[in-house]
Every structure is written in structure tokens, then in C-alpha cells.
């Protein structure tokens, strides 16, 4: 029986306000995890910055850190928390998504996946045990199970076979995680495991898989294989189908999603955890989120705009600089431009989650969601 870590504090409709207790601090949910693929946010954002902008959880990538600097080096440096000077929770994804999306020459077998590194082409094998070993070396707070991220579209026959294999892989992940957590030299002996629900856009397969993995009594459950080309309506339909069949006393994580409007829709359906590279990636290109939706600071109309990115925003960029100045930095190819916009976008997302939590606490989430969607008008 897993230790009770999640407490449901309040429900407003299906929207959930909770707390998730971890060895590295208590996470207030719903939460957006800030993505630092290689143990850093792209855009010259430090772990100190993350604290300043309200980040609760940092997400790093198993596949990328395995390739460089190498998970064994991270372990020798005392684990990811010590390595990147971050004392709050870290979630590591299993590497599965990158293996299936980035790596070349994949061969999927029952034991795992054979593939070529996207960096130097060398042959690598990763299976459930290897993914758990790498994540154990990294010492993250939460490890994700190794699964196959099914391409969209896929035939029903292929999805059924893939989901059955993902279930067998999850059983192996759990067994290996239990073994690793018992070893004397393990970085984090309380490392937690989240399982991942798959099934493409086939609701009945999704539901059966949710029922199966629910019985494994894991620390949390993710809905994977979305935001890979399906429509928003298909994504929401899958969430509606799956959430009722996952345990109410465990957090639910929607992987890789997404836009602020997607987050509001998913929170309304009972989702607790989110992550996406979108706010940082957009920021690096001058696309920033505001209370009126997303704007592109590269546009000529901002050349003489003396306002902050988003009036009323308390992020470091908005408190100190104008749209005109930041646009100038982009045109001059100054790195500070990217840094300021990434800081702003991540602050925007973290503050959105704080406001969502307040709305659920106050029992006005439906009104809050409607107001935000109206303000953004399809631009966020």
C-alpha cells in the first residue's frame, strides 16, 4: 500500500483543489510544472529565478540527461536537486516520449526499445528497468513509468497491443522502483512512481487501461499520448472518459498540455498536474501571454510602446521594462530579451495556477474560467 500523500481539500464541480506531500515539499494543486529539459530552463533562467516567479515543481528529462552529462555523473554530484541547486520537487519523465519522437532507427521489443542517439547516432537500449535506474540515479521526487507514446493516428489493433505492452512495462517499472528504493546508495529512497494511461483516442481502451493501472496502487496517474495531433475536442473527450476511472485520492497529471485555455478545460475535468514547453519556447521567440491573450513583441506596433508586457503583472520583466525596450533587445539579438520573456511567461502560468486554486477554494471556478476565456478571446 502506498503512503497517503494526496489530500483533496475542495471540489468545485469536478475541479479539484489539493495538496500532494513529497520529500521535497508539499505541492499545492492544480499545479503547472516548469520544464527544464536538461536541468535548466532554456532562456538563461536559474533555479533562483524559478523560486522568484512562483515555480513549485521543476520537470527534467530522463532521455536528455542520460545522454548528457550522464545520469551516473548526476548521481555522483548528489542527484539532480544538489546538481542544479533546487530544493523543491522535481519530476522526471521516463524518456519514452523522446525515444519515440526524437531518436532514429527505433525497434520496439518486449524487453524495451533499441534506438540511435539523436546527438551522435550511437546505439542505445532503454526498457522499464533502465528508465527506472536512470531516474533513480537522478534522484527526482517523482519518476514516470516507461511507456510507448502511441502515434496519432494509429489503428485500433496496434493501440490494443501497445497498451498491453505498456501495462507489462509498468509492472516491471514498479518492481524495479521498489528494488532501487531499498538500496543503500540510492539518492532518494522515497522516490515516487506515476503510471501513464494510454489508448490513443479510443475511449473504451483508455477506460480499460485506467481500470487496470488503478489496481497497482501507484503514487499518481498520468494521462499520456495526448497533444500529439488530435483535436482539442478529442483530447477533452479522452479526459472526460478517463478521469472517473482513476483513484480520487491520487493526483492526475495531463502530460504535455499546453495552452492556458487547455489548462482551464482540463482543470474543470478534474486534472491536477500540467507541464508544457510552450511558455518558455514562446518566450524565446518574443511571444508573450497577457490578460488579453498572446502578443508578439516583434511586431512594429510595439516599437514605441511604453507599457510593460502585461499591466499589473508582478514578474521581473513587467516590473522593470517596457515592451519597446524588450522588442529592441530582440532586434539587437540580446540574450536578455529571451530571458525576460521566458520569466514573464512562466510567471504568467504559475500565477494562473494560483488564481485557479483560489477560484476552486472560493467556489467560483466556472465564473473564473468563463471570464478568462472571454478575455483571451481564443488567443491563449
Swiss-Prot record:
Pathway: tRNA modification; tRNA-queuosine biosynthesis
Keyword Zinc: yes
Keyword terms, alphabetized: Glycosyltransferase, Metal-binding, Queuosine biosynthesis, Transferase, tRNA processing, Zinc
Entries under SUPFAM superfamilies matching the protein: tRNA-guanine transglycosylase
Class in the EC hierarchy, top level: transferase
Catalytic activity, EC: 2.4.2.29
Record: residues binding Zn(2+): 313, 315, 318, 344
One of the GO biological process terms: tRNA wobble guanine modification
Protein name: Queuine tRNA-ribosyltransferase
Organism, as annotated: Clostridium perfringens (strain SM101 / Type A)
Amino acid at each position: 500500500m502506498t503512503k497517503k500523500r494526496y489530500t483533496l481539500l475542495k471540489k468545485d464541480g469536478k475541479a479539484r483543489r489539493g495538496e500532494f506531500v513529497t520529500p521535497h515539499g508539499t505541492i499545492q494543486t492544480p499545479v503547472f510544472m516548469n520544464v527544464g529539459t536538461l536541468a535548466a530552463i532554456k532562456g538563461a533562467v536559474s533555479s533562483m529565478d524559478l523560486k522568484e516567479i512562483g515555480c513549485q515543481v521543476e520537470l527534467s528529462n530522463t532521455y536528455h540527461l542520460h545522454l548528457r552529462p550522464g545520469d551516473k555523473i548526476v548521481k555522483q554530484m548528489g542527484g539532480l536537486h544538489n546538481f542544479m541547486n533546487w530544493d523543491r520537487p522535481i519530476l522526471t519523465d521516463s524518456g519514452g516520449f523522446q525515444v519515440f519522437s526524437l531518436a532514429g532507427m527505433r525497434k520496439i521489443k518486449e524487453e524495451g526499445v533499441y534506438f540511435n542517439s539523436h546527438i551522435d547516432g550511437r546505439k542505445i537500449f532503454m526498457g522499464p528497468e533502465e528508465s527506472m535506474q536512470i531516474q533513480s540515479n537522478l534522484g527526482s521526487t517523482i519518476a514516470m513509468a516507461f511507456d510507448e507514446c502511441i502515434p496519432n493516428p494509429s489503428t485500433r489493433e496496434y493501440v490494443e497491443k501497445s497498451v498491453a505492452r505498456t501495462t507489462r512495462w509498468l509492472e516491471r517499472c514498479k518492481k524495479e522502483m521498489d528494488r532501487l528504493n531499498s538500496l543503500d546508495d540510492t539518492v532518494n529512497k522515497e522516490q515516487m512512481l506515476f503510471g501513464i494511461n494510454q489508448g490513443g483516442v479510443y475511449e473504451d481502451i483508455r477506460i480499460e487501461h485506467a481500470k487496470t493501472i488503478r489496481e497497482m496502487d501507484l503514487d499518481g496517474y498520468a494521462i499520456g499520448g495526448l497533444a500529439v495531433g488530435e483535436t482539442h475536442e478529442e483530447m477533452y473527450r479522452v479526459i472526460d472518459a478517463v478521469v472517473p476511472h482513476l483513484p480520487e485520492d491520487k493526483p492526475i497529471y495531463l502530460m504535455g498540455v499546453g495552452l492556458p485555455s487547455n489548462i482551464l478545460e482540463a482543470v474543470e475535468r478534474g486534472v491536477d498536474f500540467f507541464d508544457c514547453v510552450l511558455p518558455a519556447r514562446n518566450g524565446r521567440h518574443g511571444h508573450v501571454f497577457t490578460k488579453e491573450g498572446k502578443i508578439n513583441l516583434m511586431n512594429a506596433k510595439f516599437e514605441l510602446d511604453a507599457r510593460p508586457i502585461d499591466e499589473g503583472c508582478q514578474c521581473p520583466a513587467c516590473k522593470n521594462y517596457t515592451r519597446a525596450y524588450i522588442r529592441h533587445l530582440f532586434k539587437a539579438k540580446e540574450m536578455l530579451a529571451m530571458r525576460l520573456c521566458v520569466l514573464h511567461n512562466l510567471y504568467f502560468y504559475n500565477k494562473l495556477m494560483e488564481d485557479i486554486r483560489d477560484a476552486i477554494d472560493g467556489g467560483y471556478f466556472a465564473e473564473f474560467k468563463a471570464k478568462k476565456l472571454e478575455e483571451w478571446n481564443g488567443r491563449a
